[in-house]
């Protein structure tokens, strides 16, 4: 039985998982073949020397299951959401196999575990996760400290090249900008800093992209030297630190990942669709084989490795 069939045959309504996980998986099932193709493309970019793999921000864990199915020796699943980790464990019982290690946490958790277990992963793969990570600088720093020659592959729909995708994502980001701005305003107002309305407004603007914990650590306005300048800087959830979507230029990823090398690969459309959408997807996928068609790609894949 192939992996897609094993995943589809599970009775998710009777499975002991969170309602959020259940809804997320059930929404993904209609495009499961397409999603697994994306995971396969990411894994195909890894060299044969990779044996220990990290599925970072693994969510439902489908990448982990696929990696084990493909023969990776040790798959380490990492997600900060305990409900996601519990879901992967429950799915593994149903499918009959799963990741060898399940960690609940972030890159700090992964680094600590690797140090304690004396395990050095060969690669990290993340599907639709890099655009949500709170602080990319320490993220890449921790991965490099675990293994200076770490292979990394990240797919992201937050492509800066496709104007249609950017427009759609900006609409989503604008919706959350206002919500997160009000959340920061209300939180800062509770800190008893005796701020004037203008000072409070400055704080709200200057703390864009920060969590409540980081905001609370600032004890005076002088600590904020400049207002952040990303095009849409309010889309960081101040409670969780997760960004709604973050569209970064490729040069930013290259700067953050240095001295590692960043390669850019084009994504592809869902050719499993029927009718006109399926025909259009197959035509676009054909065009994506041609040079200079990056603005057509619905997502991008970043391959990061040592020079």
Could you describe each region identified by the protein language model?
Residues 1-119, 272-281, 296-300:
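Conserved N-terminal segment of class I S-adenosyl-L-methionine
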Residues 51, 122, 150:
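Conserved acidic residues
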Residues 84, 132-135:
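Short phosphate-engaging motifs
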Residues 125:
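A conserved beta-strand element that flanks and buttresses the S-adenosyl-L-methionine
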Residues 129:
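Hydrophobic adenine-recognition pocket in adenosine-nucleotide-binding enzymes
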Residues 134-301:
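S-adenosyl-L-methionine-dependent methyltransferase catalytic module, highlighting the catalytic core
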Residues 304-306:
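Active-site beta-strand termini and strand-to-loop segments that position acidic
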């Amino acid at each position: 039985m192939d992996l897609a069939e094993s995943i589809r045959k599970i009775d998710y309504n009777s499975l002991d998982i969170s309602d959020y996980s259940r809804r997320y998986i059930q929404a993904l099932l209609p495009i499961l073949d397409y999603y697994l193709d994306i995971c396969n493309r990411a894994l195909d970019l890894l060299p044969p020397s990779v044996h220990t793999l990290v599925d970072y921000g693994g969510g439902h864990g489908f990448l982990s299951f696929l990696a084990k199915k493909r023969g990776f020796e040790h798959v380490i699943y990492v997600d900060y959401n305990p409900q996601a980790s519990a879901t992967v464990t429950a799915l593994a019982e149903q499918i009959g196999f799963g990741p060898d290690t399940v960690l609940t946490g972030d890159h700090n958790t992964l680094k600590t575990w690797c140090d304690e277990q004396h395990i050095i992963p060969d690669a990290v793969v993340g599907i639709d996760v890099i655009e949500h990570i709170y602080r990319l600088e320490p993220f890449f720093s921790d991965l490099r400290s675990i293994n200076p020659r770490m292979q990394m592959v990240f797919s992201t729909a937050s492509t800066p090249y496709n104007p249609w995708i950017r427009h759609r994502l900006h609409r989503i980001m604008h919706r959350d900008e206002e919500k997160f701005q009000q959340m920061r305003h209300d939180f800062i107002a509770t800190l008893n800093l005796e701020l004037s309305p203008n000072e409070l407004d400055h704080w709200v603007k200057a703390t864009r992209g920060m969590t409540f914990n980081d905001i609370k650590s600032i004890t005076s306005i002088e600590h904020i030297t400049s207002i952040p300048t990303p095009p849409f800087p309010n889309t960081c959830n101040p409670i969780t630190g997760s960004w709604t979507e973050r569209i970064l230029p490729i040069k930013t990823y290259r700067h953050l990942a240095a001295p590692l090398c960043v390669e850019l690969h084009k994504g592809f459309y869902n050719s499993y669709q029927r009718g006109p959408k399926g025909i259009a997807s197959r035509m676009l996928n054909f065009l994506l084989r041609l040079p200079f068609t990056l603005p057509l790609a619905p997502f991008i894949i970043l391959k990061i490795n040592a020079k």
